Amino acid sequence: MTRLRKIIHVDMDAFYASVEQRDDPSLRGKPVVVAWRGARSVVCAASYEARVFGVRSAMPAVRAERLCPDAIFVPPDFARYKAVSQQVRAIFLRHTDLVEPLSLDEAYLDVSEPKSGIELATDIARTIRAQIREETNLTASAGIAPNKFLAKIASDWRKPDGQFVIPPQRVDAFLAPLPVNRVPGVGKVMEGKLAARGIVTCGDLRQWALIDLEEAFGSFGRSLYNRARGIDERPVEPDQQVQSISSEDTFAEDLLLEDLTEAIVQLAGKTWNATRKTERIGHTVVLKLKTAQFRILTRSFTPERPPESMEELRDIALALRARVDLPAETRYRLVGVGLGGFREKEAVVQGELFEQGPNDSPRS
């Protein structure tokens, strides 16, 4: 008999920006952008007040400034964010040992056999959110479902400071009208390819046979087939091994930093394509350089959300170049672009029975 699974995805609300607003009362209620200023800088995070103007994580900082001229830019303090993240994780561990962190601000929890004595997954999620608020003065949203894929979608449903449950008996009804662009892993390019074939919702996807989806979209076709049916058998894995994918290029002639643009763009494309062939998503972007004197230096950046396109990866890599502080006349013999902090893509299974608490039923 298949074990009944109860999975919670907890996502802190505008985490980096919320920490800044918590610690500096003058920032509360104002549009806050967590980013270094500069032509090549990118946005780490944006408060909800800034998001109203269209500011998003991984966006070039100059664009964020154009969209929201009154935004207050705050340089990131990752040591502080990590300390808060550890507080939050300690709360998770009171309820289950099966905690899979995805980044500083989100994690999956398997509460099928909870430690805390609370039986309903919805009550566990509500308790965790209350403890986070009480102990950190921050808010979190939660999704509760029979698997990781659905829990991830559910956590976005009532943001900020809310929770949403998708019980197994409602999975089909929930997914049928869901736009394919709400499915993790379906970006603008894939959305366009699907729309060209008349596929706009998960219900449309269900009309396609597996063999036809695989013929049209290769190995990703199976993921689409499974997602449309709410299928995801991946376990919550507390000890995910960190991996990375990178591409490097050694030049025939040493180049100046300003001459590396084309190489960085090409390498970002190679790294992105290599990542697409795996079932994993990289969160941390790394730029590697080797000088003519064989000195190696790296610059890295972890946005609030993983890069969702080659263009985002490219822009972050180019922004990291601006953080290289060697003399302008320094020449380089090698450049590399990498992605690290990997986790599995969302997708791959069938739900099992789920308890539902009061006031947590899906909206029609």
UniProtKB/Swiss-Prot annotation:
Mg(2+) binds at D11, D105. It comes from the Bacteria. CDD domains: PolY_Pol_IV_kappa. It is an enzyme of class 2 (transferase). It is found in: Cytoplasm. Binds 2 magnesium ions per subunit. Monomer. This is DNA polymerase IV. It comes from Stenotrophomonas maltophilia (strain K279a).
